[in-house]
């Protein structure tokens, strides 16, 4: 999403069953939810459960750019709905993957064992030379938006060059691997 200075919406979400995740990549969002105002700078993250009644405006002089991931919430009897969560990636320590010397890490805004959440948006980071050293698959479809850097990504046995601004949508069980050759780090926003 791109919002010009002075733009925004007093009612961006019209579906009362939709949950949303906002992730700011440029500018500053003024988010109002539950009568509280939050300023989301780059790296800012907001989880908004269904019927949150939020507003979002760009009160800054710079263009606001953010990702808005929406999904109908799947209720499960006996499990409470998630709470609103406002944070910034800089406030969360990345978790290094085992046996990677810290060259492959994931920043998790919500822990995967929190069953209240039926979708997740994380940041995956590879330092130069970092790899997914094996073909992996996932049971669910998922999307990747490249935030920074360049890499080659194995998608269903085809090696594809990807860079900042690229988007990939992977079907369930699509074999994948990655090599981030550098010179800088490679990062992507992961939705699943």
Predicted regions and their residues:
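Conserved short histidine dyad/triad with adjacent acidic residue
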Residues: 1-16, 107-110, 122-138, 172
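A short, N-terminal "cap"/entry segment at the start of jelly-roll beta-barrel domains
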Residues: 5, 11, 61-119
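Short, solvent-exposed loop/turn positions at domain surfaces
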Residues: 10-11, 18, 34, 42, ...
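Glycine- and acidic-residue-biased ligand/ion/polar-headgroup-sensing regions
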Residues: 17-30, 34, 139-156
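Long compositionally biased, domain-poor regions of proteins
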Residues: 30-32, 55-58, 127-129, 150-155, ...
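Short acidic-glycine-tyrosine-enriched beta hairpin
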Residues: 35-50, 156-172
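Ligand-binding loop in jelly-roll beta-barrel domains
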Residues: 50-76, 164, 172-192
